[in-house]
């Protein structure tokens, strides 16, 4: 999701790498699930997120899309996101005790919260959001430990590649709207269906490693 932000307004003003320490440790979020409520369609999922959910829940992507996930247009491209459910607008994976039922394989956005990503120059750095988490007694922890992600450098490159791949597509789709000779709606739908089919719906290899190759994913 493309956002124009002022880091001075939403963060502590610093940019972090995964080797830095930041006040992210919420001590297990004991008694709190605020960040799992009222998120609308903002928890957009990348292909690895969906692969992990599908594999660990033993459900096809199409099955997930009829339950805890949904599709929405994000800057001109149709992408999946976590669905908020029930009257309290809670994440579909939140149980009645306010605990995450997919915590071990939760999506990347959930995994890094209350951190965000600041993208530039085909890469990104982390920033600490200061208004999003109600916990005031957070402890400092090394970011790579907080992320708890295997092969972190490879994963971070994948995240950057995926972000800028989508950004380039989204800019192309948005520019079509200003071309009176182009079938912008039809082209946007075709691009969206290609992204969904190629990167989300078509099964990856059993180890999912082909997900790190955004331009030429290996299929089985």
Residue ranges of each PLM-predicted region?
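Hydrophobic scaffolds flanking metal-cofactor catalytic centers in soluble metalloenzymes
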Residues: 1-183, 197-211
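Residue-level detector of conserved catalytic or cofactor/ligand-binding positions
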Residues: 212-220
């Amino acid at each position: 999701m493309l956002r124009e932000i002022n880091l001075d307004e939403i963060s502590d003003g610093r940019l972090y790498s995964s080797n830095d320490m930041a006040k992210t440790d919420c001590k297990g979020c004991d008694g709190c699930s605020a960040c799992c409520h009222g998120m609308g369609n903002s928890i957009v999922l990348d292909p690895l997120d969906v692969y992990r959910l599908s594999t660990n829940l033993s459900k096809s992507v199409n099955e997930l899309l009829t339950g805890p996930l949904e599709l929405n247009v994000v800057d001109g491209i149709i992408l999946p996101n976590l669905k908020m459910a029930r009257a309290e607008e809670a994440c579909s994976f939140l149980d009645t005790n306010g605990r995450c039922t997919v915590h071990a394989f939760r999506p990347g956005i959930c995994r890094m919260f209350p951190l965000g990503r600041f993208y530039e120059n085909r890469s990104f750095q982390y920033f600490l959001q200061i208004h999003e988490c109600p916990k005031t007694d957070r402890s400092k922890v090394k970011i790579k430990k907080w992320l708890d992600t295997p092969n972190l450098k490879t994963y971070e490159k994948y995240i950057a590649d995926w972000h800028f791949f989508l950004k380039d597509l989204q800019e192309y789709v948005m520019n079509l709207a200003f071309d009176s000779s182009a079938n912008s709606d039809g082209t946007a739908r075709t691009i969206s269906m290609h992204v969904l089919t190629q990167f989300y719906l078509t099964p990856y290899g059993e180890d999912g490693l082909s997900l790190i190759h955004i331009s030429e994913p290996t299929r089985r």
